[in-house]
């Protein structure tokens, strides 16, 4: 379903997908499948989706549902990282280096 795909996309964006570009040319240096990290099947845990559809919403017909989980998933992972470390990491993906840099900056 769209919701599962969006959740996987959100996890990928928050934890895996790191586009690296050459600072001089702006060209992506990891644009090939062998160097651009995507989550594999074993990287994504069980996803459980509960949909609440009031009758009042069904009367409107078909509405988009694929986009919201992309945003909310990244926010949830961001909150989990902050809860675990005590600091906000300002940039996706949350690589170990970015998390450690944010922790060092917070210490001053």
Residue spans for each PLM region:
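C-terminal catalytic domains of large/alpha subunits in multi-subunit enzymes
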Residues: 1-108
């Amino acid at each position: 379903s769209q919701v599962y795909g969006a959740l996987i996309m959100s996890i990928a964006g928050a934890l895996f997908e790191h586009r690296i570009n050459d600072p001089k040319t702006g060209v992506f240096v990891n644009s090939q499948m062998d160097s651009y990290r995507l989550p594999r099947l074993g990287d994504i845990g069980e996803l459980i989706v509960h949909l609440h559809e009031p009758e009042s919403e069904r009367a409107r017909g078909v509405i988009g549902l694929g986009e919201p989980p992309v945003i909310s998933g990244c926010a949830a992972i961001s909150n989990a990282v902050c809860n675990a470390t005590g600091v906000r990491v300002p940039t996706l993906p949350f690589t170990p280096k970015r998390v450690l840099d944010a922790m060092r900056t917070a210490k001053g």
